[in-house]
Amino acid sequence: MTSNEWSSPDSPEGSSISGGSQALDKPIDNDAEGVWSPEIERSFQEALAIYPPCGRRKIILTEEGKMYGRNELIARHIKLRTGKTRTRKQVSSHIQVLARRKAREIQAKLKDQAAKNKALQSMAAMSSAQIVSATAFHSKMALARGPGYPAISGFWQGALPGQPGTSHDVKPFSQNTYPVQPPLPLPGFESPAGPTPSPSAPLAPPWQGRSIASSKLWMLEFSAFLERQQDPDTYNKHLFVHISQSSPSYSDPYLETVDIRQIYDKFPEKKGGLKELFERGPSNAFFLVKFWADLNTNIDDEGSAFYGVSSQYESPENMIITCSTKVCSFGKQVVEKVETEYARYENGHYLYRIHRSPLCEYMINFIHKLKHLPEKYMMNSVLENFTILQVVTNRDTQETLLCIAYVFEVSASEHGAQHHIYRLVKE
């Protein structure tokens, strides 16, 4: 790997985590309408549209600084809308009942046996939450159908008219509420009616549309860390931020989308800026990552401290990649580092690894100053105007392989760094 030093523009050059409200586990009210009255069912359906399936991960409500499981959030939504208490277990049981009902409806609706077998095979790999969830189910069945296969219309819907969308609770930013769109199916999976897909029809790899990946490059891992040597043989590593995408599956929901115009002012606008890059394309290479950084570590001992960044990528192609990382303040570039990485062939694909790349002095000082602020809201106020733009290109063709915009808050959890990934689109 070859690497340039950090330079200024003017220079020559996710586990299951306990949390949420204990009130959600209280016994149900003995309301006369029964456990799932029409009013409660409406609120339940609203919550399904608002909160996507998230597996064992937690959803962070930035207004409260708390993390909730999806069923907790659904129960919370029912309580807020109706005043009736439903437990997480009741929500889980209701989802399973609806999933079985939906599976039976789909079997009855599909006349073609091959299509029915394909749908059943697809549903077998899904959780009840994903079957019931509107967007996840639609995306999954689109993949099961393949190009040109009929959509199963009538079995999914978006957020109900007049109800809040996802952005009301799961937001990429704390101060400014940017519209978050539901996941979009990838090009090539279309509706309505068409023939059964050919067995030879190509299926997009599972990471496309579900993780930070374009058609030519997939980010496997990204981390920024502080490493200390405790003794000659022992190192202690603290992760400020971390992304791991090593094992996506077709059962994972598609990423939500954010209109890229909502974040133009947070990144450089001159030549080579985010706007120009997006106009040049390809459009499937652009992503937004909201980090909740973990600053819960002692950073005063500088003697043996190393601040670094590591990242790893995979591609079906052998090429030389260039990774540009721009640190921005109030939308203006402060420093930039450019690194070049060569491919290593392994198990039928090419790996690119940028290992222990040192953080610049500006970033180290920034972390120190941030850490010494007395309150988290002060840190978040500073971070609102701090962003990082990472652009990975093919060195020889200058094609954009990945463009990732990073925004930050401080994690309010004792369980470490958190993140949420969005696709950037232009509506």
UniProtKB/Swiss-Prot annotation:
InterPro entries: TEA/ATTS_dom, TEA/ATTS_sf, TEC1_TEAD_TF, TEF-3, TEF_metazoa, YBD
Pfam families listed in its UniProt record: TEA, YBD
Intervals of motif Nuclear localization signal: 78-94
Domain of life (superkingdom): Eukaryota
Tissue specificity as recorded in UniProt: Preferentially expressed in lung and in skeletal muscle.
PROSITE patterns reported in the protein's UniProt record: TEA_1 (PS00554), TEA_2 (PS51088)
Key word Kinase present: no
Induction text: By FGF-1, FGF-2, calf serum, platelet-derived growth factor-BB, and phorbol 12-myristate 13-acetate.
Record bears the keyword Nucleus: yes
Cellular compartments annotated: Nucleus
Disordered: annotated span: 1-32, 163-206
Feature: DNA-binding region: 29-105
GO biological process: blastocyst formation; cell fate commitment; cell fate specification; DNA-templated transcription; embryo implantation; hippo signaling; in utero embryonic development; positive regulation of DNA-templated transcription
Keywords: Activator, DNA-binding, Nucleus, Transcription, Transcription regulation
Biased composition (Low complexity): 7-21
GO cellular component, one term: nucleoplasm
Predominant place of localization: nucleus
Record's compositionally biased regions (Pro residues): 194-205
GO MF annotation terms: DNA binding; DNA-binding transcription activator activity, RNA polymerase II-specific; DNA-binding transcription factor activity; RNA polymerase II cis-regulatory region sequence-specific DNA binding; sequence-specific DNA binding
General function of this protein: Transcription factor which plays a key role in the Hippo signaling pathway, a pathway involved in organ size control and tumor suppression by restricting proliferation and promoting apoptosis. The core of this pathway is composed of a kinase cascade wherein MST1/MST2, in complex with its regulatory protein SAV1, phosphorylates and activates LATS1/2 in complex with its regulatory protein MOB1, which in turn phosphorylates and inactivates YAP1 oncoprotein and WWTR1/TAZ.
Quaternary structure and interacting proteins, as annotated: Interacts with WWTR1/TAZ. Interacts with YAP1.
Name by which UniProt lists this protein: Transcriptional enhancer factor TEF-3
Organism of provenance: Mus musculus (Mouse)
